[in-house]
Amino acid sequence: MTRHSRSATVKLRRGRRSDLDALVALEHALFDSQFFAGHLIARASFRRLLASPGATFLVAEAGKQIGAQIGIQVGAQVGAYVLVLYRANSGAARIYSIGVAARFRRRGLARSLVAAAEKDAVRRGRKAMRLEVRADDRGTIALYESSGYRRIGRAPGYYNGRVDALRLEKVLGKEPRRDL
């Protein structure tokens, strides 16, 4: 999937081993290592997860567009990612981590990555997508709720014993019912 946004072309694709340095740098730039202690993905874990059949990495690769008709990108870089985990014998997938570099925010990348992750989960036979989000992160909560996620619980002190997490879930494969 390719999107054009503010003079940049954004391509969603599966993560590759060659993305390892960019993914590690993005994870550590986005998440405070003291606040998110125990939740940050280490380099070795990224490497293992990129090769794991129980995980899907999707990345948004952004670059300058040249030749609009032929769609060539130059200077492409990983601007965002989502990591989805799949447990055997579970009907649900889990968004474990999602991040968008500051300079690529407000372009719909997170929403596009979540939608692509949901499609992948449906393709793998999952009936629901679950995740945790900081209870004080109103913007991210609004993104998920506007995408059909609902609150199913709260985890006190989930983030380093200091901030609660909300547990969210979306039933996949069905359009939400709209009352007339």
Spans of features found by a protein language model:
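Acetyl-CoA-dependent GNAT
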Residues: 3, 14-105, 111-116, 120-124, ...
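Alpha-helical elements of the RecA-like P-loop NTPase motor core of helicases
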Residues: 21, 141-142
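C-terminal "cap" of GNAT-fold acetyltransferases
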Residues: 57, 127-130, 134-141, 147, ...
